[in-house]
Structure formats: structure tokens, C-alpha cells
């Protein structure tokens, strides 16, 4: 199973991943010492799971995930490679607002018998904004937050959810090579997201 956590800044995507990482033994794939690059992914083994978990991206910084990966194609390549090794957990701010590229990946993996879950975290906008403000204060940023970008992205994410479930022809024009389908899109409770997402893997 591939689980793509989606949410705007401050929604808790990275917090969910770190919560799941805390449930087992984590090994970085592609070393991080010296001048070596950041990890390509992490291997997570959890007692009781039938498959290992692969977590895409780097979690060396406070805000982890895939946003430091250079292209969406590279993210998709890693997802596809690691999906053949076990479960995959992936998140990032940029990918949270994209549909067509990941609908194509969804359908490609589905044809191989690998489920793809679009997991949208239901964090209220004001909570997201407050968390972003807190991060800025922790960094020493004193200028007021321009809320427009986070607000716009919060609404964009909801539009992507609609595209997943409403099967509109206009939304699928750029999903090249695949027929319109209802995708497995789910809302995740921001208050219990770690246990809810982990439960899908158990």
C-alpha cells in the first residue's frame, strides 16, 4: 500500500510521519554523514506488520518530506521503486496540491495490484495558520504572516480531493493513458491521524 499524506503548511503531515517512525526501528537509505546527500528514503520495520514501511524523502529538518526532492518525477520514481519492497508513506507540501501526475501513478500502481491512498488531513485552516506563525516565531521571523498563500493552498487541497472522487472528465484530461476512475481518497482526523493511518497498514 502507498499512503500519500496531503495537507497545507501546518496541517501535521510531518508530525504524522514522525509518529509512525517512532513505532519501530528506522534506518536511513543513502547515508547522511559528511558530504553525503540526504537520505533518499527510510526503512521502517514495525513488529506485527506483514511488510516493512518505506518513507520517502528526508526528515533531518523540522519540516520533512519530499519538498527537497528536485522533481515530481523523481518522487514518483522513488514511490514506484519502494512500493515493490513494502508499504510506502510519502508526503510533501508541493505534491499536496497536484492531481494529474499522481493520478497517473495511482493507476499505474493499481494495475500492479498496489493500492494507493490519498490521505487528506482535515486540520482546520486557523490551526494551520497558528502553527505556521509559531514556526516563524521560533525562527525569529518578526514580519506578519501573509495568510493568503496558506489559505489558497488549503482550499486547493480540497479541490484535489473533489477531483479524486467526482470523476469529472475535465479533471482527467491530463491523466494520460488512463480511464476516469474514482480514486481512494480519504479524510484523516488531524486529532488521531497517526493511529488512523497506521491502522491502514496493520
State each model region's role:
Residues 5:
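Hydrophobic anchor at the beta1->P-loop junction of P-loop NTPases
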Residues 163-202:
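NTP-dependent small-molecule kinase module
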Residues 14-27:
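A conserved segment at the C-terminal end of the G1
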Residues 39-100:
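Conserved nucleotide-sensing/catalytic segment adjacent to the nucleotide-binding pocket
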